[in-house]
Amino acid sequence: MENKTPEKSNGNNAEFLRIENITKSWDAVTAVDRVSLTIAKGELFALLGSSGCGKSTLLRMLAGFETPTSGKIFLDGKDITDVPPYERPINMMFQSYALFPHMSVWENIAFGLKRDGMPKDQIESRVENMLQLVQLKPYAKRKPHQLSGGQQQRVALARCMAKRPQLVLLDEPLGALDKKLREQTQLEVVNILEQVGLTCVMVTHDQQEAMTMSSRIAVMSEGKFLQIGSPSEIYETPNCRFVADFIGDCNMFNGSLIVDEPDHVVAETPECKHYVGHGITGTLGMDVSVAVRPEKIVVTKTKPESEFNSCQGEVVDLAYLGSYTTYHLKLKSGMKLKASAPNIDRHHEGAPTWGDKVFASWSESAMVVLTS
């Protein structure tokens, strides 16, 4: 998974949404556990985690559908913790889209504006503007069942934005779409939100979706934030084993620290010695994990010269995936190692194949040492 470069801006960096020590508990179950967060105006922020991690509960508290057990929520400097949903300048778009099947696209977008008593001429102008923004003007008279999944998603987004809320909440916004359409729609949604300049918080369990769409990500587990950062920070420098393993594919070598210098460390695992080109906060002999992404590993039939950062194994499986090939190696220690290589040439003569004895190696900057 690769994020677009350069990375998306964090809005204008002015604090807009602030969450202070929010907790939500039901009897003995704590769904959200003392989380704090600030989000800038115009930022697209993702809450990422597996089912049951607390991300949707947090989103519902932002919307006002759930009341925090403790903590505060501030929007544009105002305490909205106890403000009911219908009085919050916030709109939420659900995974199901919740479009009215008996209404046309135009009528769906206009619905909230009519409920608010907006003058007819202003409604017409606003709806036309939204239709143009989401590129659905030719479909204004169609009913939802006459649209594709991606078009329905854009109608729901237009309806969500039509009232010009201060904050937009997206709950698994693209979960109902197939993979190819989902990937295409991700960038469309980002472009629309950026054009309008809205601040957005989205919930997803899809790592690629979070990394493609958001400027920053909070990885959640058991009601807590484990790491908050840009997509590249989360992917390249995870701060714990869970984040490294949850975001993308990762090979985890478990061992102990045998050299601890300010500019480098050496960790020893059953597979090999790892020379890591940066220091860590730790002590000799402590248990560590060395994380290496598959795409940072080079697979060759010849043994590397260095005594560090390489190990021997056998190709037990491989998967040709078009743009790259993934090798599954069984190392002497019994560990299964995953390595990915780009398919630069159409036919790569001499490339490793099933049953080959090979060497896997990686650079000193390809690793992250994890202590928790």
Describe the predicted segments one by one.
Residues L48-S50:
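The feature captures the beta-strand-to-loop junction immediately N-terminal to the Walker
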